[in-house]
Design a protein with these regions (language model features):
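N-acyltransferase acceptor-side catalytic subdomain
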Residues: 1-152
Length: 152
């Protein structure tokens, strides 16, 4: 399968054309418009800081549907007796930044300055969200992602 080169125009090839690993395109930018088009088509950026932007669309994707989450009895019991608290959208900037920093202490991070700025823009437009885990007032964990429709 060919890998398509993106330019300044906001477009993507048909996701069915992704290679066997899911690589679909290279280039383009992380503008809000392009990211929205990407995510609505199951495409996402993932690349090393020294490389051009790579756009992926693997055949299988992990999605969370918040309306369908089932919290087990043991998890409810744990949550009732732990000093950890969970919040949503209380500190998006620190969640994405800390995800980046923790990776830098190991082998580097695919979350570049440009990526961090792009997802902060999405959050400011209510298109991304974060889940935070706190121990007292200390942020000890979290996740972030794009939320379009009922999927996250």
């Amino acid at each position: 399968m060919p890998v398509f080169r993106l330019d300044d125009q906001i477009w993507f090839p048909d996701p069915i054309l992704a290679d066997e690993n899911g690589l679909l395109a290279v280039g383009g930018d992380l503008s809000t418009k392009r990211l929205l088009l990407a995510y609505t088509n199951g495409i996402f950026p993932w690349y090393n800081p020294e490389d051009e932007i790579l756009w992926w669309c693997p055949k299988r994707r992990f999605l969370i549907f918040p309306d369908n989450i089932h919290i087990s009895h043991s998890m409810k019991k744990f949550m009732k007796h732990t000093d950890l608290t969970i919040s949503i959208n209380k500190n998006f900037k620190d969640v994405i930044h800390n995800c980046r920093l923790l990776r830098e202490e190991t082998e580097g991070s695919w979350i570049t300055d440009e990526m961090e700025e792009a997802y902060n823009r999405l959050f400011s437009q209510n298109l991304a969200l974060s889940v935070e885990v706190w121990k007292g007032s200390l942020l000890v964990g979290g996740l972030y992602g794009v939320s379009l429709g009922r999927g996250f």
